[in-house]
A protein has these predicted regions:
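RTX-like calcium-binding, glycine/aspartate-rich low-complexity repeat tracts
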Residues: 1-169
Length: 169
């Protein structure tokens, strides 16, 4: 038991950011701020930019970086480092699906990490946790609507379709 948290989430400041303390090459604790100004402006429900921002900042807190060399603001035409840089591929991207003219996708906010995020997290943590893709569901797994994942296997994956009305692709 400890009196300090590994992950501290607050709304003290008006901006959205994450900061991590690193010790011996590992994150020892992180602070995430998504200010009340942010949630007042973008809402707090599922499918809002606020929820996507919280996911993005948690991504930083657990070791993920942006998809390019940008921070604070960016333009796809001048800052994207690869052709698929958009929310469609990663919650860590700064670019909506409609900002990236190279992808065919509808504008939508993300409800979960995207494909690139899962791959990066697997790369960072699978050797330490045993939760990597090599230990994930095998076979013809259906995620979301009409999932074949039972609640006993993963209540989180089982419940995703209850919270989303539109996909981010």
């Amino acid at each position: 038991y400890t009196t300090t948290a590994d992950l501290n989430i607050m709304d003290t400041y008006s901006s959205a950011y994450a900061y991590s303390y690193v010790s011996n090459g590992k994150i020892s604790s992180s602070f995430i701020n998504v200010g009340s100004w942010w949630t007042d402006r973008y809402g707090t429900d599922f499918g809002t930019y606020s929820l996507q921002t919280i996911h993005h900042e948690i991504g930083h807190a657990i070791g993920l970086g942006h998809q390019g060399n940008y921070n604070g603001s960016a333009s796809y035409s001048s800052d994207a480092m690869y052709i698929n840089d958009s929310w469609q591929a990663s919650m860590m991207s700064y670019f909506s699906q409609s900002e990236n003219y190279n992808v065919i996708a509808s504008y939508a906010f993300l409800m979960t990490p995207s494909a690139v995020d899962w791959i990066a997290l697997d790369d960072i943590y699978s050797d330490y946790s045993g939760y990597g893709v090599s230990n994930a569901f095998t076979g013809d797994t259906i995620y979301g609507f009409n999932t074949n994942i039972s609640a006993s296997q993963s209540n989180i994956w089982y419940s995703f379709s209850d919270y989303i009305s539109s996909a981010a692709y």
